[in-house]
Swiss-Prot record:
It is found in: Cytoplasm. This is Guanylate kinase. Its main location: cytoplasm. Residues 6-186 form the Guanylate kinase-like domain. ATP binds at residues 13-20. It holds the Pfam family Guanylate_kin. It is an enzyme of class 2 (transferase). The gene is gmk. SUPFAM superfamilies: P-loop containing nucleoside triphosphate hydrolases.
Length: 213
């Protein structure tokens, strides 16, 4: 038995709020943290490997896993199915390692309602303002004005569900937000349910106490 059970760390935010950067920093801070590998029904792209970028499944295989309750969360996006297989996540957290999820609020709810939900830690990242959110999207130089407008419209749908999350951070300073994020993760790792070895330790203390009498 490991001293610690891993967490399911869920990071969500509207596009441009800094979630991806914070996720990279979190994984740099703790190289043992694993990023969740999703399953998908889309075809592999050149250079992609099964089990590394994605678990590539047929539609029948994917739907079968959903029916059997083997997906923590799943969604249909642009004609393909995507989801988080429960098996690899369960194995990872039982080995004492955390798993990081980049999902939206709907994925957060599904994970929270799964049998692993009691080990979930969900964090929502807010921008300091809508004006700053647009500025960040435009400064990337990656998207057309039309795509940016679509992302801005979707951002309110994401932001409006902030109340589903355990913690909400306003990312007005990236370094400060990173430190707050690490503080949250460090504290949540110490939750009683995340320390399976505690029960045996308490039994040992009880036995020692009884030997005194």
């Amino acid at each position: 038995m490991t001293d610690r059970r891993g967490l399911l760390i869920i990071l969500s935010s509207p596009s441009g709020a800094g979630k991806s950067t914070l996720a990279r920093r979190l994984m740099s801070w703790d190289p043992g943290l694993k990023f969740s590998v999703s399953a998908t029904t889309r075809a592999p792209r050149p250079g992609e490997e099964h089990g590394r970028e994605y678990y590539f499944l047929s539609e029948d295989q994917f739907k079968g896993q959903v029916r059997r309750g083997e997906m923590l969360e799943h969604a249909h996006v642009f004609g393909n199915f995507y989801g988080s297989p429960a098996g690899p996540v369960r194995d990872t957290i039982e080995a004492g390692q955390d798993v990081l999820f980049d999902v939206d609020w709907q994925g957060e709810i599904q994970i929270r309602n799964s049998d692993l939900g009691k080990h979930a830690l969900s964090i929502f990242i807010l921008p300091p303002s809508i004006k700053e959110l647009r500025r960040r999207l435009e400064s990337r130089g990656q998207d057309s004005a039309e795509v940016i407008s679509r992302r801005m419209l979707k951002s309110w749908d994401e932001i409006s569900h902030w109340g589903y999350y355990d913690y909400v951070l306003i990312n007005d300073d990236l370094d400060a937000t990173e430190e707050r994020l690490k503080t949250i993760v460090s504290a949540e790792r110490m939750r009683r349910i995340q320390q399976p070895a505690l029960q045996e330790h308490v039994r040992k203390l009880q036995s020692e106490f009884e030997d005194l009498s």
